[in-house]
């Protein structure tokens, strides 16, 4: 990856995720990125990393890699650091724990509205929500 401004010490956070919709196998790759969240019922798990952003001098070559399984009926939420300040995301954990819906767009909208109310939009906000429905076989 070539980074613009590398000679001046520019850097960027990278937050990638792959998810197999059939098995739920999910892998997070994080370079200095904000936490992600896994929700199933009233339980919420925070997925974090310790690596520095990409492009910093002396940064290790590999991102933090976390492998998990997204359960059927579970949601995966990825945010940028403009949504919730690092270390101040308890409100988001509580919001996710109390969410009982299945519509990813509605959940993203709710997170954004609460972030605007709390954080006053001091940075850009990016929110992605993935919902893994129960298998059709179990629904019949």
Language-model features, listed with the residues they occupy:
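Intrinsically disordered or compositionally simple regulatory linkers and C-terminal tails
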Residues: 133-140
């Amino acid at each position: 990856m070539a980074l613009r401004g590398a000679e001046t010490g520019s850097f960027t956070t990278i937050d990638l995720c792959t998810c197999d919709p059939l098995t739920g196998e999910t892998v997070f790759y994080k370079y200095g990125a904000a936490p992600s969240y896994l929700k199933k019922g009233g339980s919420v798990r925070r997925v974090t990393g310790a690596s520095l952003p990409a492009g910093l001098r002396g940064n290790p070559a590999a991102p933090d890699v976390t492998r998990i399984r997204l359960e059927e009926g579970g949601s995966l939420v990825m945010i940028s650091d403009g949504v919730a300040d690092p270390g101040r995301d308890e409100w988001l954990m509580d919001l996710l724990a109390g969410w009982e819906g299945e519509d990813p767009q509605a959940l993203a909208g709710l997170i954004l509205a609460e972030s605007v109310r709390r954080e006053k939009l001091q940075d850009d906000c990016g929110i992605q929500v993935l919902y893994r429905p129960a298998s059709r076989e179990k629904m019949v």
